[in-house]
Amino acid sequence: VNESAEYSSGNIQYLPGLALNWTVSPNATSYTFSLRQGVTFSNGDPFNAYQVWAQMYMIYFVTANSSSWLDSYNVFNMNTANFGPSTISLMNQSGLANPGQALLSIMDNNSWPIYVTGPYQIVFQLAHPFQYFLGLTIVFAGLIFDSQYVLEHGGPGTATAINSFFNQNPIPGTGPYEFSHVAEQSYALFTQNPNYWGANLTPQQIQANPFLDPGHVKNVVINYKTDDISRYTDLSTGKAQVAVIEAQDWNSIVPNPKFVYYQVPKYSALEALFSLNTKLYPTNITDVRQAIVHAINYSDLISKAFLGQGQELIAPEYPIYGQYYNTPGLQPYQYNLTLAKQYLSEANITNMPSITYTASSTTVWQGIAGQVIQADLAQIGITVNLNLVPYAQCQTYQGTYTYNLQLLKNSSVASQIAIPGCGPWGPSELTPADAWTDFVSNRSTIGNVADYSNPVVETAINSFFDSQNTTYIQGLLTKAQTQLYNDAPLITIGLGLWLVDGSIVWQKGVINSFLVDPLTTGTDTMPILNTITFG
């Protein structure tokens, strides 16, 4: 519902989009959104609260009615909602522009966690206080699409058979551009939306929320090219105005004054992480993990794998949440071979087995990082076997916390060192609970490749969801952060380049400016099309 957020000096501001405004109950369990009137989707279908209601419950339905359907956050009591095929059938009969009484009696039922109070007002009733709920509304389920169009083209499908019609036929949205044509694995053509509600916004209104800009060109073509040389050639010849350039051609970008590349701001959430498995021998021994984190030359790792642009962080919180980041004031793990050997000696392992580093072969940096770690750990007597597999295969080795524990039974896929997400990590949601929940919690749906869970840490994570007292949360996080630091299940590198070993590049004077995904690649890696301005 809430279309956009904006970073400002390390703070996060939530800006009105399709929601003109919202109110929050004193106990942070009820969020009421007043929606913008007179808005249509690009195909002319009206936008209203009924559309939003339908979208939320259809997403709930295709997740097999999972309690954590909203971006993996279990914030609703879904037991009071009875949404299923019969409800979808009723929506088909009634439509969403002016629902009939039978459907309306369901939509405005305030015993359900999400309900409407009129055509332009919708309420989200949480099961417990969560003061960061707005951070869930700017991603995935909160990116509003035309539910009426979904109904008219076969419905959403089911959890085991999601409707594939929309793969080649994108669902209309309310934004400044619409799809004109899509050729999968080839290109996508966007055209300015003739029905865009913000087409006549004043410069002052756009300045207040630049994500609402109607755009500065009529048509945008996005070509899908996997070859870095082809992308560099298109950029350097002017065939493309913006391109992704990676390590292969990066040395042609940096020294050339005609090129400009996007650098990740100081306040960011873009990271590369290395998990040390806490359940698999020998990294299930804390002293072994401490030996590993002190045996790695981080300056060398950043120089070789991340093109010199990055910094070691204190896991797991993102630095953008300054009030919750590294509350004990710890120092990042230091490269110290003497200390590493001491920890390894204290582990008291007679015959150290080799360990496995599993990562994706699809991107160069993961292999380079593996080689650096391999060489560093060899200095303290640990042999590292590199297991580089295609990205799609790597993804099958990771999942929920429970799924990851089950994988340990399969020695062919279990590994002591792995990269969460098999690539760089941008947050799934814009909340300070995100990193803690994803990387070090037993409620994790993706990211906890370390198979880590500790009662002190879990208690601190729970405080995000049952307290509004920042001081109280910080106190618990200080204990959790110290526990986590001593347990050493994670190494975190804050990235300086948008794509780890490359970035978005443009020619100076051709492109003036643009905005990017506030979730730092968590939702999208491209420039936000309507915000691109030209020189």
State the predicted function of each range:
Residues 69-154, 183:
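Surface-exposed binding/hinge segments that line
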Residues 48-57, 119-129, 175-176, 214-219, ...:
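Alpha-helical secondary-structure segments
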Residues 4-9, 125-130, 136-219, 229, ...:
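Gly/Pro-rich hinge or "lid" segments in bacterial periplasmic/extracellular proteins
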Residues 66, 180-191, 221-280, 410-411:
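Extracellular/periplasmic solute-recognition and catalytic clefts
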Residues 44-45, 229-240, 287, 371-380, ...:
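Short helices/loops that flank or line small-molecule/ion binding pockets
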Residues 20-86, 123, 231-234, 282-284:
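Aromatic- and charge-enriched surface segment that lines or borders ligand/interaction sites
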Residues 183, 187, 270-271, 293-325, ...:
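Detector for C-terminal structural segments
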Residues 1-26, 172:
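N-terminal lobe/hinge region of extracytoplasmic solute-binding protein
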